[in-house]
């Protein structure tokens, strides 16, 4: 175009700023990535937003609005360009609010803008939409309070162009061809029209031809999107001084400008002024805050909060910790009293989601102070009686954390030494208990009598389940794991069970007991100690490469340290001992003889054992061991017998 005289009236170009629209799913995904993937890494990560395609704009698109949601972090294909245009960039998610505040915002914006400037200086980049339209977002996630601080920037380079005229008449003849190009071709935001041809390459631009900018907003004033700035700067750098420019809009409100560059104000060898930080609704510069605590479903908040502390372990302390294997465990707790209450709470703390209680007792007035899953009202709420422990414990867990899958069964476990007096009922209890073992991965034995643990011990080994045991004394406790049979290991190396040190089968220990013998008389803190150690032993076992087959002993290469066999604690001198005992081939609960007989006869074997402990001792070989011991004792005493003739010798 011909040059314009210096006396021509000039008018500065006004632009419509870009706005961001961030859906809550964007922050939900960001928090997930921060916990699981980014962790302490605050380097830039790719993101993308999407802008409504210019041919789809309507009266509500008075600002160019970039949308961000959960898909902004996807690394897959871009959005459908027929409806939306991808806008790519980076997120810088810092680790502290102080770091967010202390970052020099102007300096970092200049750095981002300089990246665009350097690409222009390089000269090898044409006016690609992706190159000249970048988004950057500075963010900080307060994951405990669900508050997200963020500030979007859309870097733009300034150049001193002025409006010196308009040409509405010439505009009309170009609109049809531009409209057809926008409607049918891949999106190009800035190009030149040369005899009806679309020219996209900067090297082919001619000053005498008309430039076209496809606007991404329909502002009522003639103020194009601020995206135009970067394209105008390219033209200024390439030596264009006077241009004709059409700002195309799909609603028929396009306009035609004649622009002139004030080249005296253009710094040839310096980075231009850079702007781009998004402003607040009041027009001031500043970051935004998204407080999702009141928007997210409380149950979802609880779910995320439970996982938060666990996932933070993986940031520095235990990066290889396998939380999924813990979360997916199905845990059966036999006993819903003091031990059951504390064990279940510790399991939930580790993220276990599936917990089942078995107990046959009701809540009494003495229970709530020691058993934290129960309260005073539970002692009389069932028609004057206490509620069933197992059922109430399961419901309490759901009240504490709604996402937990918790069930309770009022079930009496058949006990060795207690003869069968109602076979139908006890057989039903046995069948139900057997089914529960099938449906769970790990079993905790938390009952208050020795004989009640026998059948679960047998079932655990027969069904190859992880079994952990916790037992209390007045000022002592035992926590142990039972050994499991593995085809890969010699059974001789299997660690023992609760009964492996016994030379007699367990028997009735509940009959004819005084009150202090019937109640659990133990120092209150002992149960907490035993419960926590039992759960931690279980978690350490899951992190071991060999899981329940792990051999006891120290190791420096394990995620959570060693996996002992037994832990015995004593409060009278505040000591703990780690012990290891092998399985006993004549054990009344885990010996091969018992397991083989149980697998062969099932309930019939159990019934015979319940009715006659001698039958069990004969099956496992303990009876023969006892007889041999008696015989050896008799022989020893016989050797020590003195004849009358020897009396004088001994007396001398």
From Swiss-Prot:
This chain belongs to the protein called: Ubiquitin-like modifier-activating enzyme ATG7
Superkingdom per UniProt: Eukaryota
Q: How does it assemble?
A: Homodimer.
- GO molecular function annotation: Atg12 activating enzyme activity; Atg8 activating enzyme activity; identical protein binding
CDD domains in UniProt:
Apg7
Q: Where is this motif: GXGXXG motif?
A: 335-340
The UniProt entry lists the main location of this chain as cytoplasm
Q: What is the lineage of its organism?
A: Eukaryota, Fungi, Dikarya, Ascomycota, Saccharomycotina
């Amino acid at each position: 175009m011909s040059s314009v005289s210096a006396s021509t009236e000039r008018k500065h170009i006004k632009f419509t700023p870009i706005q961001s629209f961030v859906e809550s799913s964007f922050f939900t995904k960001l928090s997930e990535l921060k916990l699981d993937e980014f962790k302490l890494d605050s380097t830039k990560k790719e993101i993308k937003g999407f802008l409504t395609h210019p041919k789809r704009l309507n009266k509500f698109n008075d600002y160019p609005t970039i949308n961000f949601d959960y898909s902004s972090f996807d690394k897959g294909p871009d959005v459908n360009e027929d409806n939306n245009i991808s806008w790519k960039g980076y997120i810088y998610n810092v680790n502290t609010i102080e770091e967010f505040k202390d970052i020099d915002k102007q300096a970092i914006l200049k750095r981002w803008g300089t990246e665009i400037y350097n690409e222009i200086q390089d000269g090898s980049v044409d006016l690609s939409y992706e190159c000249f339209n970048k988004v950057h977002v500075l963010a900080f996630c307060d994951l405990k309070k669900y508050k997200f601080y963020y500030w979007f920037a859309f870097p733009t380079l300034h150049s001193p162009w002025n409006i010196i005229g308009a040409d509405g008449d010439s505009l009309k003849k170009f609109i049809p061809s531009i409209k057809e190009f926008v409607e049918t071709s891949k999106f190009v935001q800035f190009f030149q029209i040369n005899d009806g041809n679309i020219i996209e390459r900067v090297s082919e631009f001619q000053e005498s031809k008309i430039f076209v900018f496809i606007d991404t907003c329909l502002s009522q004033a003639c103020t194009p999107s601020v995206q135009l700035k970067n394209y105008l700067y390219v033209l200024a750098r390439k030596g264009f001084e006077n241009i004709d420019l059409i700002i195309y809009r799909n609603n028929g409100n396009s306009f035609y400008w004649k622009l002139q560059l004030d080249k005296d104000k253009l710094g040839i060898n310096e980075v231009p002024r850079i702007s781009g930080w998004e402003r607040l609704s009041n027009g001031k510069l500043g970051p935004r805050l998204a407080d999702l605590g009141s928007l997210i479903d409380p149950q979802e908040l609880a779910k995320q909060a439970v996982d938060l502390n666990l996932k933070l372990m993986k940031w520095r302390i235990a990066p290889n910790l396998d939380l999924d294997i813990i979360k997916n465990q199905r845990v059966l707790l036999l006993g819903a009293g003091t031990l059951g209450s504390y064990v279940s709470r510790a399991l939930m703390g580790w993220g276990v989601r599936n917990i089942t209680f078995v107990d046959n007792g009701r809540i009494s007035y003495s229970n709530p102070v020691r058993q934290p899953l129960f309260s005073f009202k539970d002692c009389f709420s069932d028609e004057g009686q206490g509620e069933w422990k197992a059922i109430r414990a399961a419901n309490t867990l759901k009240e504490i954390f709604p996402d937990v899958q918790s069930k309770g069964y009022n079930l009496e476990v058949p006990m060795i030494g207690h003869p069968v007096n109602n076979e139908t009922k006890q057989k039903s209890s046995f069948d139900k208990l057997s089914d529960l073992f099938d449906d769970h991965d790990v079993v905790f034995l938390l009952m208050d009598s020795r004989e009640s643990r026998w059948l679960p011990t047998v079932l655990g080994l027969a069904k190859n389940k992880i079994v952990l045991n916790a037992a209390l004394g007045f000022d002592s406790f035992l926590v142990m794991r039972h050994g499991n049979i593995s085809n890969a290991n010699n059974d001789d190396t299997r660690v023992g069970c609760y009964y492996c040190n016994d030379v007699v089968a367990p028997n009735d220990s509940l009959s004819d007991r005084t009150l202090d013998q019937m109640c659990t008389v133990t120092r209150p803190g002992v149960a907490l100690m035993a419960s926590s150690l039992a759960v931690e032993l279980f978690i350490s076992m899951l992190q071991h490469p060999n899981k329940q087959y792990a051999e006891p002993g120290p190791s420096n290469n394990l995620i959570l340290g060693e996996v002992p066999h037994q832990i015995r604690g004593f409060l009278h001198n505040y000591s703990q001992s780690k012990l290891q005992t092998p399985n006993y081939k004549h054990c009344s609960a885990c010996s091969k003889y018992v397991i083989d007989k149980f697998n062969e006869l099932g309930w019939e074997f159990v019934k015979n054992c319940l009715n006659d402990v001698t039958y069990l001792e004969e099956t496992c070989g303990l009876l023969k061991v006892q007889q041999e011991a008696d015989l050896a004792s008799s022989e020893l005493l016989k050797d020590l017998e003195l004849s009358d003739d020897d009396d004088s010798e001994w007396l001398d």
